[in-house]
Amino acid sequence: MKKYCPNIAGIVLGLLFIMSAVMVLFHLVKMPPPPEGSNMAMFFAAFGPTGYMTFVKIFELTGGILVTIPRLRNLGLLLLGPVIVNIIAFHLFVAANPKGLIDPILSPIIMLALYLLWVGRKNFAGLLN
């Protein structure tokens, strides 16, 4: 069982990011607009036209695919790490809603990523030396 948990966690985390990226890149879901004049509206107004959101979603797609493949999981975590940190920062500072961190989608993403980092901590130890 211990052998399969990281694989299951990697597949679930990868699929969450793959689905998120595909939905945005191929315009499968229309996102409701944020309230006018809010920090979120200004944030997304800057991200949309510049193409930065597309860049982030391509990273999410690539990282999600890599996390689902056990041999490439750590590379995928290296790509997804900054994305996850930015999602957390968005909820804390832009949306100004710390309760957003217990979102039913965001909480499992954070927990799965932390679990996979813990499982692969020996592989990441070389980066700290």
Model-flagged regions — what are they?
Residues 65-66:
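C-terminal ends of transmembrane helices
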